Each structure stands twice: as C-alpha cells, then as structure tokens.
C-alpha cells in the first residue's frame, strides 16, 4: 500500500528522487471508533465543519503548507462558534501538517489573534520519532490521524489525563491528472471536538 501511494501521489520509489525536508511519509495505519448511546468519559460535544481553502500551492512535496490555511480557518471558526480560547482545550491536534505546516498554522493563527503554540500537536509529528527515523516533515495520510486518534488521543481522554481536545484531521483533495496539468492542490477537512 505504501509503495502504491508514493507512486500515485509523489514519485515511484524506484525513481530514487531526493525528498525535500518539507516532504512527509505516507502512514499505512488505520483506526476505528464506534459511536454509541452508552455514556462514557469520551464524547463528542460539538463540531465545526471545515471548508475547502485553496491558496494555489502546487508543490506535492509540501502538503503541510497546502493544508495549513484550511486548518487555520477551521480552528479559528471553532473558537468563535463555541466562544472558546485555545486554553479551553488540553490539546488542539491537527492531522498531518507536519513540521512545516505546523509553523505556517501557528503564524496564520497569530495573525487572527490566536496563539495555540502551547496546546498544539500534530499527528504527523507524533507518529514517527524524528530522532530515530528520517521522516522529513512527519507522517501523512488518513491513516496518520486515524491511528493517532485511536491509539494515543482517545486513551488520554479515557483515563482523564485530558478533559477536552479539538481534533482537526487535515486532508488534501488531489488528482494526479489535474496536478500534472498545473492545477493547484485544494484542501478540505472536518473535525470533531471531544
């Protein structure tokens, strides 16, 4: 699966290209959660739907920069919708912005008057150990956010270490054909408040 994803949306592994530091690695993980009526410590208390934001970026090796504006827009909208400050969350967790996208996100939110640097984590940065693994900007793909949510974030809510998180899985709408024709990569995602 990993090789297929790399071939479809980046470069075939056999091509041997050099990855730029902004590139991320496709996570071939998964996660599943079941919603039910039974009361538990973990619950969804609200949601803010994200929207497509297209800054016209065309670098398929820098997905974090492509997705950061959409993450910024939804986080800011959530804070307005629920009349909250970043400090009202134990963690604000994005899906797969990685190192580069995180820096852009923090800068964009500061321009809107929000500093989330203390609360922010990114699944793409949490899933790999950069000291032991050469993973560039971090992990990417829907498996990244899903596996970190299921195996790392939800247990912290369940055991009471955290009371409230803002989970913002990020994603890029990609077409290898339109990208090769010179179109930009648009971004869309949604999130859940837990």
Where are the language model's segments positioned?
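Conserved small/polar residues in nucleotide/adenosyl-binding loops
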Residues: 1-2, 190-194
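Short, well-ordered beta-to-alpha junction loops that form the rim of enzyme active sites
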Residues: 3, 94-97, 169-172
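Active-site-adjacent elements of ketosynthase-type condensing enzymes
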Residues: 4-15, 101-102, 148, 175
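Long, repeat-rich segments with strong aromatic
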Residues: 79-86, 91-105
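Short glycine/threonine-rich loop-to-helix capping motif typified by GTGT followed
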Residues: 97-112, 177-184
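Internal helix-turn-beta structural module
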Residues: 153-181
């Amino acid at each position: 699966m990993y090789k297929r994803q790399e071939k479809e949306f980046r470069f075939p592994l056999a091509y041997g290209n050099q990855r730029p530091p902004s590139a991320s690695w496709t996570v071939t993980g998964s996660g599943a959660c079941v919603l039910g009526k039974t009361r538990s410590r973990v619950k969804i208390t609200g949601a803010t739907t994200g929207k497509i934001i297209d800054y016209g970026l065309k670098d398929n090796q820098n997905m974090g920069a492509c997705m950061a504006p959409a993450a910024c827009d939804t986080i800011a909208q959530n804070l307005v919708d629920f009349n909250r400050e970043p400090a009202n969350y134990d963690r604000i967790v994005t899906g797969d912005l990685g190192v580069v996208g995180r820096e852009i996100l923090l800068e964009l939110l500061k321009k809107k008057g929000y500093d989330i640097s203390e609360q922010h984590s990114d699944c793409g940065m949490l899933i790999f150990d950069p000291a032991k693994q050469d993973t560039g900007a971090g992990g990417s793909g829907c498996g990244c956010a899903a596996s970190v949510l299921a195996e790392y974030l939800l247990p912290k809510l369940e055991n009471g270490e955290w009371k409230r998180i803002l989970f913002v899985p990020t994603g890029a709408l990609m077409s290898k054909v339109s990208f090769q024709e010179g179109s930009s990569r648009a971004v869309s995602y949604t999130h859940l408040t837990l």
